[in-house]
C-alpha cells in the first residue's frame, strides 16, 4: 500500500493506493501548525472507517507539497509512525519521464510535475493543455515531445471566495456551487451564481484564447479541487480529479526502480 499526499495551499489530499488504484482518499485542511502526531491521529480515524488495520499494509509514501512549512511535519509522520522515508516530488522527477521544463524560470510546483507525469502517461503522443484548478488555476501547455513550453496562472475558485469574504463587510459568506441560472433574486443566490458563472467564464475564456493562439491541436485535461464545477463542458476533453494523486504514485514507483 502506498500513501500519496498532495499538500496544497488550501487543502491536503491523502490517498491510499494499491497496484496503481486508489483504495480510499480524504481531504483535510492544510495547516502549518498540525504536528506529525495530529496528522497520524487524523489519518487513523479516517482510515478506520474502511478497515481497522488498513494502515498496517503501508510500505511507502510520496508527497507533493507547495507549502514548505508543512513538509517537516508530514515527513515526521511517515518516519515516526510508519518507519519509512517518504519521497518528496521535485522538478528533477520530471526527467525520469522524459519531461522538460522549457520556461523562462524552469521551476514549477510539485503538484504540476505530478499532473504532467500522469497526463503524459495516458496521452503520450498528444499535445496537452493540463488545467489544475486549485487555490490558483494553472494552465500547463505540454507538447507531444514532453516539453512544458507555456503556462497561464489565474485565481482559483477558493481565492475568489476568500476575496469576497475578506473585501466585503455586508455580503453574506457563501461557497461556490453549481447554479442553473446567473440572474437571481436573493443576495446569497446572486453571490453563488456570480462565483460559479464568473469562474467558469474565466476558465473557458482562457482555454479558448489559448486554443486560438496555439498552432497545435490540444487535448484539454482538467483536475483539481475546483473541477467539480465543470461537468458537461464541451471544451474539456477529460476530467480526472485524481490526476495529481496518480502522478504522485507513478513517480514513487519509478523511484523504486
Curated annotation (Swiss-Prot):
Q: Name one GO molecular function term.
A: ATP binding
The answer to keyword Cell cycle applying to this record is no
So what EC number does this one have? Answer: 2.7.1.33
- Location in or out of the cell: Cytoplasm
Pfam families cross-referenced by the UniProt entry: Pan_kinase
User: Which pathway does this chain act in?
Assistant: Cofactor biosynthesis; coenzyme A biosynthesis; CoA from (R)-pantothenate: step 1/5
* UniProt binding sites for K(+): 132
Which biological process, per GO, is one annotated for this protein? coenzyme A biosynthetic process
| Entry keywords, A to Z | ATP-binding, Coenzyme A biosynthesis, Cytoplasm, Kinase, Metal-binding, Nucleotide-binding, Potassium, Transferase
Residues at the active site = 111 (proton acceptor)
Binding note for cofactor: A monovalent cation. Ammonium or potassium.
Stated family: Belongs to the type III pantothenate kinase family.
Biological function: Catalyzes the phosphorylation of pantothenate (Pan), the first step in CoA biosynthesis.
Protein name according to UniProt = Type III pantothenate kinase
The species is Anaplasma marginale (strain Florida)
Gene name, please? Answer: coaX
Amino acid at each position: 500500500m502506498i500513501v500519496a499526499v498532495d499538500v496544497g495551499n488550501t487543502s491536503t489530499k491523502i490517498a491510499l493506493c494499491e497496484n496503481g488504484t486508489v483504495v480510499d482518499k480524504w481531504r483535510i485542511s492544510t495547516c502549518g501548525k498540525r504536528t506529525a502526531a495530529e496528522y497520524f491521529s487524523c489519518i487513523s480515524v479516517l482510515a478506520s472507517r474502511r478497515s481497522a488495520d488498513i494502515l498496517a499494509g503501508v510500505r511507502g509514501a510520496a508527497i507533493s507539497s507547495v507549502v514548505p512549512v508543512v513538509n517537516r511535519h508530514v515527513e515526521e509522520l511517515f518516519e515516526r509512525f510508519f518507519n519509512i522515508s517518504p519521497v518528496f516530488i521535485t522538478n528533477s522527477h520530471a526527467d525520469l519521464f522524459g519531461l522538460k521544463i522549457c520556461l523562462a524560470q524552469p521551476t514549477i510546483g510539485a503538484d504540476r510535475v505530478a499532473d504532467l507525469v500522469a497526463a503524459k502517461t495516458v496521452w503520450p503522443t498528444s499535445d496537452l493543455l493540463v488545467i489544475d484548478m486549485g487555490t490558483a488555476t494553472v494552465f500547463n501547455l505540454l507538447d507531444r515531445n514532453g516539453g512544458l513550453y507555456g503556462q497561464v496562472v489565474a485565481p482559483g475558485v477558493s481565492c475568489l471566495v476568500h476575496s469576497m469574504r475578506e473585501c466585503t463587510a455586508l455580503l453574506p459568506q457563501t461557497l461556490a456551487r453549481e447554479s442553473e441560472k446567473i440572474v437571481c433574486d436573493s443576495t446569497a443566490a446572486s453571490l453563488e451564481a456570480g462565483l460559479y458563472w464568473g469562474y467558469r467564464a474565466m476558465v473557458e475564456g482562457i482555454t479558448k484564447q489559448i486554443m486560438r493562439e496555439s498552432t497545435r491541436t490540444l487535448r484539454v485535461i482538467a483536475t483539481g479541487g475546483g473541477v467539480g464545477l465543470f461537468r458537461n463542458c464541451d471544451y474539456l476533453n477529460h476530467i480526472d480529479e485524481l490526476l495529481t494523486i496518480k502522478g504522485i504514485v507513478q513517480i514513487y514507483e519509478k523511484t523504486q526502480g
